[in-house]
Regions:
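Structural helix-adjacent loops and short alpha-helical linkers that scaffold large soluble proteins
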Residues: 1-16, 26, 84-101, 143-157
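Short acidic alpha-helix initiation/capping motifs at coil-to-helix transition points
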Residues: 75, 98, 132-134
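Extended glycan-interaction surfaces of carbohydrate-active proteins
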Residues: 24-65, 102-171
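Alpha-helix N-cap/helix-initiation motif
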Residues: 8, 62, 66-69
C-alpha cells in the first residue's frame, strides 16, 4: 500500500500492537530479551516454520533465538521506523531506530559463527546451534540486511555448498 493515510488509518496501530506484544511477551514464551533479540519456545514445543514434531518428539528443536525470526524482527523494526518517520511520528521513529540498532549489534555478537563464516541457526543461552540450515538466507534476502556484503556472500555460499552436497548425495 502506497497510500500513507490508509496505512496510518488501517494498519499502523495494528503493527504497533504486534511489536508491543513481542516486546512485552506473549504465549509460548515469545518475548524480547534484554539484548533486543526475540526468544521463543519451551521444551517440547515447535514454533518456527521448519520445526517438526511427531507425537511428543520435536525432531528439530529450535527453542531460543532463531536466526530467521530475528532477521524478520529487525526488518519489522526498520519498517516501523520508516512508517513512523513518513507519518511525522519522529519520537516513535527514533524509538524503533534505537531498538533496531540494538538488535543489529546483538545479532552480530550472537549469531555470526566466526569459525564457520556463517550464521548460527539458533541460540538458547550458551547453546549455539551451528547446523547449516537455509533459515540464515532470511538474514541476507530481506530489505534491511544486518550483515556486511562479504558476510552476506559467505552465508549464500555456505548454504549453496550444503545444498549441493545434499543434491549430490541424493542423486
Amino acid at each position: 500500500a502506497k497510500d500513507l493515510k490508509t496505512i496510518q488509518k488501517d494498519l499502523y496501530g495494528v503493527l504497533k500492537e504486534i511489536v508491543a506484544y513481542y516486546e512485552k511477551g506473549t504465549r509460548y514464551n515469545i518475548h524480547r530479551e534484554a539484548d533486543g533479540l526475540i526468544y521463543a519456545g519451551d521444551d517440547g514445543m515447535q514454533l518456527t516454520w521448519m520445526d517438526a514434531k511427531i507425537g511428543d518428539w520435536v525432531v528439530t528443536p529450535r527453542k531460543g533465538k532463531a536466526v530467521e525470526i530475528n532477521a524478520l524482527w529487525y526488518n519489522a523494526l526498520k519498517i516501523m521506523s520508516f512508517l513512523a518517520r513518513e507519518m511525522n511520528l519522529h519520537g516513535e521513529s527514533t524509538r524503533y531506530d534505537n531498538l533496531a540498532r540494538k538488535v543489529c549489534k546483538s545479532f552480530h555478537d550472537v549469531f555470526w559463527y566466526d569459525e564457520g563464516q556463517y550464521l548460527y541457526d539458533s541460540i538458547d543461552g550458551e547453546i549455539r546451534n551451528s547446523a547449516i540450515r537455509p533459515n540464515q538466507i532470511f538474514a541476507v534476502s530481506l530489505p534491511y540486511p544486518m550483515l556486511s556484503k562479504a558476510q552476506q556472500r559467505r552465508v549464500v555460499d555456505v548454504v549453496k555448498e550444503q545444498l549441493d552436497k545434499l543434491l549430490f548425495v541424493n542423486s
